[in-house]
Amino acid sequence: MKNISEIINIPEDYYDLYGRYIAKVSLNVLDYLKNKRYGKLILVTAMTPTPAGEGKTTTAIGLGNALKLLGKNAGIAIREPSLGPCFGVKGGATGGGKSTVEPSNKINLMFTGDFPAVSAAHNLLSAVINNHMYHGNELKLDPKNIVFPRTIDMDDRSLRSIIVGSGDRSTGVMMNDKYVITAASEVMAILALSRNYNELKQRLGNIMIGYNLNKAPIFARDLKVHGAMASLLVDALRPNIAQTSEHVPAIIHTGPFGNIAHGTSSILGDIIGLKMFDYLVTEAGFGSDLGFEKFIDIVLRLSDFKLSAVVLVATVRAMRYHGGGRINEPDVNAVLRGSENLMWHVQNIKKFGFNPVVAINRHSNDTDAEINAISNILTKNGVEFSISDAYSDGGHGALDLAGKVLKSISDYNPRYIYGINDDPEEKISKIAMNVYNANSVEFSHDAVKTMKLIKDDFSDLYVCMAKTQSSISDNAKLINVPEGFTVKINGININSGSGFIIPLLGNIMTMPGLPRRPASENIDIDDYGNITGLQ
């Protein structure tokens, strides 16, 4: 690794060092960069993933490295890892092989403290809510109708439903409560969407915490706590910069999940990156049905920058899986069947007005016959593609991909799935039927009740669907390209601070659980404090 000062092309007055290899950028760097034009934004998405993921982050990093090798002024912008997946199923989120961001262990394990700051600000509000009710409840908050949860950056299913204040009066007001993982916290979404401190504080104040006894919504600003919450996030709003394995600057900031949140790194990081670099590569969580849709329908609407190219990551193993084969066993016929999922994502991206470049992320047990089968399908359908060896060869393995992405860059005008003035129920239905392939949408009794409140007070909010990442549908068991199904809306969260409602589809959980053999079993330190086993 190089000292971070060697690769950041901005004066030292505009960033603070966190050791030799990490820096936090000050927001006033935008004054320094104000006369710079935006560069070209390249978004990396994927086909419907297997549990281990398809290498979207690895591809984004490799693409950034390749652009540098081609002599381009390039950077990347990705999300910060959550401890939940690090210790759970998926492992770390810093790429892999020869396409990583460094120092990877530091980045994976709490980094510069942004996640703990989000958790602290979030839980401060939770503490103040209960404290307000304990000390007389001037706002007449209904303890049975508090909708703001608590948060922790860990997978822990035992916290999905809890009771607080269950002792004597000294333990506070007894009520039902729950935890969400920090990546699904509304405060995390607010941090990712805020462009300055004033907007941050305003959004925090707009968080709806619940209802009073007269059924009127109550907000964080009513408790006069949003300023204190913002004080905990002063440094967290500042984007972090590290570096790739080939010394490309990497903006790594905020970490909302793509399935239960909006799934992209911060808008502020994108703005700064697009001013610093001619080409900025970013990524959106999970498949094009999740993070990509939310990037178009939410992030681009809130921003003044444009998206210039889209990369769609595909793998042979994912096509084996969607074709009914075994993930690690070569099977050309399964790949041919599973390619329907890939082609569905190609067409889905085109619905939004973009022509993607498919990056086939090659794995060691992919056979030539399988690669050729996919290549023939893409060629037959006129889809630009490249075989990416970013994992094994770093930037050199993504040079062909980089060249094709550069050729694909265009002044695209996105086509949004819904209008901001559409009825909230119509917004949800348009996403379900136009993006998820559903025949119809069914709202539960609880969802219908919440929808009435939304129509009265929050009809102008965006929609951020929470659903499984393992299927285009709301049912993780329906692989490949399911048809003829009904999307079930089992509840709706109102995140008025972040500016969207979150319909809860199928059996989606905002607090994951650990698997039978969590990744934490493999992580250790040696006698010198070196971390091992973090993948």
Curated annotation (Swiss-Prot):
<dbReference type="GO" id="GO:0005524">
    <property type="term" value="F:ATP binding"/>
</dbReference>
<dbReference type="InterPro" id="IPR020628">
    <property type="entry name" value="Formate_THF_ligase_CS"/>
</dbReference>
<protein>
    <recommendedName>
        <fullName>Formate--tetrahydrofolate ligase</fullName>
        <ecNumber>6.3.4.3</ecNumber>
    </recommendedName>
</protein>
<keyword id="KW-0067">ATP-binding</keyword>
<dbReference type="InterPro" id="IPR000559">
    <property type="entry name" value="Formate_THF_ligase"/>
</dbReference>
<dbReference type="GO" id="GO:0004329">
    <property type="term" value="F:formate-tetrahydrofolate ligase activity"/>
</dbReference>
<dbReference type="GO" id="GO:0035999">
    <property type="term" value="P:tetrahydrofolate interconversion"/>
</dbReference>
<comment type="pathway">
    <text>One-carbon metabolism; tetrahydrofolate interconversion.</text>
</comment>
<dbReference type="InterPro" id="IPR027417">
    <property type="entry name" value="P-loop_NTPase"/>
</dbReference>
<dbReference type="Pfam" id="PF01268">
    <property type="entry name" value="FTHFS"/>
</dbReference>
<comment type="similarity">
    <text>Belongs to the formate--tetrahydrofolate ligase family.</text>
</comment>
<keyword id="KW-0436">Ligase</keyword>
<keyword id="KW-0547">Nucleotide-binding</keyword>
<feature type="binding site">
    <location>
        <begin position="50"/>
        <end position="57"/>
    </location>
    <ligand>
        <name>ATP</name>
    </ligand>
</feature>
<keyword id="KW-0554">One-carbon metabolism</keyword>
